[in-house]
């Protein structure tokens, strides 16, 4: 099985594909944008919850660091959830310009966020949690969201 770092980095790539699909559909029709936006939000929320409910909890339990990088990542997740909510609202009122502006802001935040996780947090997590990688990955894969 892969490492925690490999698993979560790969999942970033999967979410990026949903984002690209969402951007592409926005240029074609608002209905297509709505569907792909919902798919992106769902998959991104699943990724956030895999981190927050499993990996962050395991990392904090093992290291005792609760106010460090995981706290910052949770804060950034909340910022991105807020942007995604605003994207939904813009699509609900057919405001394509606002939607596109929000997606641009989200893309920048996501890129910066993912870089921090992939270059800092995931290697730290792997260092502390490597003995439990398989169990942690299995737990993350079992996350279900509504």
What is the role of each PLM region?
Residues 1-146:
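Small-residue-biased structural context
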